[in-house]
Amino acid sequence: MYQMDEETKKKWVWENAPLHEVILDMVIKHHPNPIESQTYRIPKIWRGDLESDFGKDLMTCNPNGKLAFVITRIVIDPKSGKDISAGRLFSGTLRPGTEVYLNNLGQNQRIQNLYIYNGVKPELLDFIPAGNVCAISGVLGNAGETITLEPEQPFEAFKHIFQPVITKAIEVKKAADLPKLVEVLRKVAREDPSIKIEINEETGENLMSGMGELHLEII
């Protein structure tokens, strides 16, 4: 192998040790599965009664227990423009059409579809049991929301320790495009909690604040 040229080396490595297989094998071998990890993770991230039925379901990652899904990220569906809430299912089983309770908002909403991401492609499923990282549509909540069937002690809220450090004014060339701009900025703020969107009341400018020049340029 030492005598191979650079391109031949790359080809050999790809054929004999494809990166995606190596990484997935390492994750499977070295990362604890949800049934093992939740026994020591739950006491650190959930402040409820561990001896309650709900607490026991969380500790054992019980697919037949009370539902507990925590939103960790909001993704905007490019086709429908609607929210897709990604997160982890700690207990219970998700099914389309289920009416759920958003503990932080104090609202009942209904799940429409269930997804598991295969790479960047979402796959529709009929049910998803506890222990999976998945996504749901039809529910409008924020990152950190705890979704259950009835009011329960929620998981600890997410804390964003970084504050925006740079602000830029966003303008449109045509006044008729202003509603589109406002909608795009709203979606950006939904997907990235570190972005702050506001309107300057004196000038009427739409202001977008982020973590730096590169952060705003990427968006």
Enumerate the predicted regions with their spans.
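Structural and coupling elements of P-loop NTPases
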Residues: 1-219
